[in-house]
Amino acid sequence: MSWPITQHAGVLRTEVFDGLLKACLLCRGKTVDAEKINNYILEIGILTANVRADSNQVDAWRDYQQILSEFGLIYSTRINKLLTLTPIAMAYLNNVLSYPELITLQLLRYQYPNGHKSQLSPSLIKSYGANFNFESFTAFQTYHKIQLRPAVLIWKILYKLWECGEHPILSLDEMQSYVVRCTGMSDCFDCAKWIIDSRHGDVYLTPMVRARRNMADWIKLLSQTLLFSTNEDYNTIALSSYSIKERDSVNFVCDRLSEPHSFWSYKEGNYKENWFDFYGNYEENIAYILKESV
């Protein structure tokens, strides 16, 4: 098991979100004019030019647009050639949501399986050999009954550690050895117990080597939310002061987002587009918004 997520976690900040979304407005409802968007991104100075070796052309948009599709702010341009912003992106642009509120909401709702991270890795296919017959990573995870929201899971594990009198902090090694092994939301309690036992020398699981990069990216992303704090090296994650102060409200949201019926369900056909319909929805997710000022 691994949790694939954008590899651009390190550049995520308010200015980047604002700049990329405003760049989208230049081509909203139209085919992407990459040159126009790239020039705008360079002009406002939010990201590097990213000159491609094969063409010697600036292509910041091609490299960074996945940040927006990853978090349900635009439909992936692979499935919709017209640049389409989702309702949740418009709520942000209309100042209904602040950046911390938006990123907290979307990371709490981010789930596996989903319709965006659908590409199969060659190593996964190879590991199953001739018996592998899945057309997408989404179908593969669905078949194996994966149903997971990493941000919610991590919060609940940290909260359980806090309730048990343990230090409410997870190291990257603990994420890699224990947390990533979870396949469902109910695993959070067993996972917390494994971690507590390991801290007292009673159990030790070998780290899942291939998961380390994804775990590190998740820690970086979660540092942008209201709920978590990290150290400067992004190799530990802890509950933020907001999480402790507002623990009843956060726990309520996390409990609701742990319920099976709250998850998007994979169905063959237009599952990729259906994912963006679900994940980019605003009105049906207002109840999950944790306000920055309370």
Locations of the language-model features?
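Donor-sugar nucleotide-binding helix/loop cap in glycosyltransferases
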Residues: 1-294
